[in-house]
């Protein structure tokens, strides 16, 4: 059974992950593309370096906003980690937030 505390913790984790402009840009890109993308594609599309993209993707993955899978690219002869959005909805209202403190 999921408790109110667990619900609050999951909500806080998602809000924290979405609370950075670059992570919002990553989510927006994945939503627009509507397909799994690998790290280089994401970094190139957003004009950021791979290391920075990876840090933010890890945070989004830990929050359950994106998921990743490793796929062998036979053409390149290496494994690539692809990222895609996990469907999610965030509903916030004063009534919902009131329940948090009760």
What are these regions (language model features)?
Residues 1-16:
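Short, Lys/Arg-enriched N-terminal segment that forms or immediately precedes the first helix
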Residues 14-49, 72-74, 79-83:
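N-terminal helix-turn-helix DNA-binding core of bacterial DNA-binding proteins
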Residues 44, 61-62:
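Alpha-helical residues within the helix-turn-helix
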Residues 57-58:
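Short, hydrophobic-biased segments on the C-terminal half of alpha helices
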Residues 74-102:
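Conserved segment of winged-helix/HTH DNA-binding domains
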